[in-house]
């Protein structure tokens, strides 16, 4: 039975490590065995402990920029990021306590202070990791009254398949890394420093004028509605999904066809696809209009 609900594939935060060597450690009092080199985040996720994260996703290498996933290690100093800290024999890791909760809420508050609070009209409509993490860290108010924000940044709608709305960008760099690691096109960079950092296609160009090949890896990597499929903006979030195979060429990429009733709203490369491992080209990803063409 290929039909499935909208349950997304679990995101372990960092990619799996392929090694025979195993390491034993303790996370929140639970004993865990994980391959050497695995991140603390992934090891925790493997036993059902989901450490809050924004810049980490298991299709790309860890980056350690959002600072939401900090943990404490017994006998260790400070609060290392669990996405970039590998497991080690005998480690005792704490992922939840009062101090960590305060730090995470503080970090989250800063993100939200420069983010439009238009969740009611946002096309992400609940499919938003920023919203999820605000809930996960227990953020209930934002005390900052920002003097400077990016809320008036101009939208780029030049790409026929997706829009880029920098006002919603949290500069997690997931799109830049997906373009680099998954697709290998290097169309995106982070331009500027500090508060002026922004995602830039090419040399500050529109998406359509950059090197972008419209593969959609960046859209899939984006945790907010900054990069969003135009089909979702037009039709809203899908309600159910079916695993299917792309019919364009002989590679046989596996997809989740996300649907609303009988209508395909979005094609998402299936993470467990043996031929494509969660990636695809523009044809399978966006050119699905023929499927229901009359």
Residue ranges and their predicted role:
Residues 23-89, 98-103:
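N-terminal cofactor/phosphate-binding cores enriched in small/glycine residues
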Residues 3-12, 67-71, 76-214, 219-245, ...:
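Fe-S ferredoxin-like electron-transfer domains
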Residues 2-35:
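Generic start-of-chain signal for non-secretory N-termini
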Residues 35, 98, 102, 170, ...:
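Conserved active-site and cofactor/substrate-binding residues in soluble primary-metabolism enzymes
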Residues 16-23, 65-69, 249-253:
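A short, compositionally biased
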Residues 31, 187, 254-256:
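Short, surface-exposed charged micro-motifs
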Residues 260-294:
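Cofactor-/ligand-binding subdomain signature composed of acidic, glycine-rich
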Residues 242-272:
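Catalytic and ligand-binding motifs that coordinate phosphates/metal ions
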């Amino acid at each position: 039975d290929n039909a499935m609900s909208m349950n997304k594939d679990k995101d372990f935060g960092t990619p799996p490590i392929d090694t025979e060597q195993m390491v034993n450690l303790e996370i929140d009092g639970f004993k865990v065995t994980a391959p050497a080199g695995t991140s603390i985040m992934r090891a925790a996720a493997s036993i059902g402990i989901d450490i809050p994260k924004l810049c980490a996703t298991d299709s790309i290498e860890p980056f350690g920029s959002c600072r939401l996933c900090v943990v404490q290690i017994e006998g260790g100093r400070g609060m290392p990021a669990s996405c970039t800290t590998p497991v080690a024999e005998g480690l005792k890791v704490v992922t939840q306590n009062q101090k960590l909760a305060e730090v995470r809420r503080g970090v989250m508050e800063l993100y939200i202070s420069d983010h439009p609070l238009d969740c009611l009209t946002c096309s992400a409509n609940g499919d938003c990791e920023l919203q999820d993490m605000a809930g996960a860290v227990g953020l209930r108010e934002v005390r900052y009254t920002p003097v400077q924000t990016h809320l008036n940044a101009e939208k780029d709608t030049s790409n026929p398949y997706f829009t880029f709305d920098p006002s919603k960008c949290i500069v997690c760099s997931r799109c830049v890394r997906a373009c680099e690691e998954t697709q290998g096109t290097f169309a995106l960079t982070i331009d500027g420093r500090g508060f002026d950092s922004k995602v830039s296609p090419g040399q500050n160009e529109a998406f359509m004028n950059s090197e972008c090949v419209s593969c959609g890896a960046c859209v899939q990597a984006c945790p907010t509605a900054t990069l969003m499929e135009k089909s979702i903006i037009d039709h809203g979030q899908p309600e159910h999904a079916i695993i299917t195979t792309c019919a364009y060429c002989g590679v046989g990429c596996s997809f989740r066809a996300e649907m609303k009733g009988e209508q395909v709203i979005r094609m998402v490369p299936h993470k467990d696809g043996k031929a494509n491992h969660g990636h695809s080209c523009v044809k399978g990803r966006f050119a699905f209009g023929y499927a229901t063409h009359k």
